[in-house]
């Protein structure tokens, strides 16, 4: 059905309201360094970092349905590149080099894995992370005779947080554009059926490698931004495989059907991991395994899928029981009306906005 002028007006108003709300939210988050304690700021750094990692991971894996465990490889490349070059280059120059190294590595890996899918792609990603970690350990022991690098730079926690927040905004914007573009539609078709995507004229190798590079660049930059937070970085810390598994679990817990889905996995898991690592450090891995089992058996579509199914069930009209007549039938009909989508504050703002900006036909 063709979109009417009223639909266009409402969609435009919703877009304006959404942009205004997101601007206020980002502004409030940007003020966190001046409002929170050192511990609170440290927690926010961890959470925003995982937001970047999870959304960047979902750009590739959420569309192509190829589960990547190479997150720790690119995250570690970004972190260790800064650690190696910080003594001979300015900080932002090390960020640029880390970005270039991450993109080049993603290009090589993307080309090598064009014909790999399923569990073989998962194993390759995990093996890549371990291979880079072992090569870095070998290099440090045999060439530099050390097992780590010191990172001393005037880049405090507030600056790290602000840069990560800006990176999170950018990766969300890229995801928003991707979901509304022909390229993003092609990626979704590749995830559904790669053979069909090729038959309709989509350049499958180019699309997969391109989105893999984009995802890897954001992951690498997040690792580079996190490097100044720690005074000493060693290969086992930088290329920790736990990062890859945590990101996957966060993404699946939140759900990949919506762009904001990963947030529903990042926020609760970051809070719980902070508590567990502080109070019960040896139970954290067991907890992650339990969460993954719950997702597989009970939440295959994540929290977003659960919310959508629940709302659909509430919106479905109830069937009329047999035997109800007269007033009882009328009462049941009122109770069984479908629940309409609440408009809330956004709806009130939209109505006010419509009064301020009337339809073109109403202008004099």
Q: What positions do the PLM features span?
A:
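Transmembrane alpha-helices and adjacent helix-loop boundaries
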Residues: 1-364
